[in-house]
């Protein structure tokens, strides 16, 4: 857990478009970015670079970038929703749960397990320990 980033695209949100008849909710795609520094770790006893390791049960508390879609996502009906870590490294376990790594699949702008945008961890939070399994 550190200064890593998860990117999800497209995060399709309903955006009011002004027309002469009044605002019309229109689905528009936005990029969705989640910082791993805002993730609540599920494994506090496994440290990498003096920071708790992130596993598949960790919860990203905030993802942003879709604030213009003020009516929320077409699937989750949220904006700035949570990030769920969907697929991790099954050969390396952190507290018995698959570890998250660079290129791990995420679901972003989520309501429980219902993601509005598919995503992936594209910027590592540390480069001391590489999870290649």
Model-derived segments and their meaning:
Residues 1-133:
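Intrinsically disordered, low-complexity proline/glycine-rich segments
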């Amino acid at each position: 857990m550190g200064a890593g980033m998860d990117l999800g695209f497209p995060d399709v949100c309903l955006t009011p478009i002004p027309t002469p008849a009044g605002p019309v909710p229109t689905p528009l795609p936005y990029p969705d970015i989640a910082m791993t520094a805002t993730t609540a770790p599920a494994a506090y006893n496994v440290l990498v670079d003096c920071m708790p390791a992130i596993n598949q049960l960790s919860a990203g508390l905030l993802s942003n970038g879709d604030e213009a879609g003020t009516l929320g996502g077409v699937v989750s009906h949220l904006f700035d929703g949570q990030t769920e870590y969907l697929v991790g490294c099954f050969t390396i376990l952190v507290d018995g749960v698959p570890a998250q790594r660079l290129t791990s699949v995420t679901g972003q702008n989520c309501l429980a397990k219902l993601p509005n945008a598919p995503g992936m961890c594209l910027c590592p939070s540390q480069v001391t320990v590489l999870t290649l399994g």
